[in-house]
Amino acid sequence: MSITKDQILEALAEMSVMEVVELIEAMEEKFGVSAAAAVVSGGADAGAAEEQTEFDVILTSHGDNKVATIKALRAATGLGLKEAKGMAESAPVAVKEAITKEEAEALKTDLEAAGAAVEIK
């Protein structure tokens, strides 16, 4: 005879908190898993609670004014003319990666002022 999910839930509802903790520990030992890992990856709310700290600035298009975009890229990255032109022409491309939110917003503003289309990821 097998136990149904409802029977398991009913048995859990009747347990004290300490008994549930002991049950979880026993299940972790038996199956070689950790309940903490399941909790972290379990819900969409868990990911929303953690704020992203590193951002990538992606140039999606150089826009109508390619020259202004190249100048803005050179100023932001320190690249030479040839490298900045290559970056502008190979969009979509990451301009800077793993930077702070403030840096990403400032870079996006500068590039958009030059006419480029930019995303922050």
Swiss-Prot record:
Function: Forms part of the ribosomal stalk which helps the ribosome interact with GTP-bound translation factors. Is thus essential for accurate translation.
Protein name per UniProt: Large ribosomal subunit protein bL12
Any one Gene Ontology BP term: translation
Subunit annotation: Homodimer. Part of the ribosomal stalk of the 50S ribosomal subunit. Forms a multimeric L10(L12)X complex, where L10 forms an elongated spine to which 2 to 4 L12 dimers bind in a sequential fashion. Binds GTP-bound translation factors.
GO cellular component labels: cytosolic large ribosomal subunit
GO molecular function, one term: structural constituent of ribosome
Keywords recorded for this protein, A-Z: Ribonucleoprotein, Ribosomal protein
Keyword Ribonucleoprotein tagged: yes
Family per similarity comment: Belongs to the bacterial ribosomal protein bL12 family.
UniProt keyword annotation of Ribosomal protein present: yes
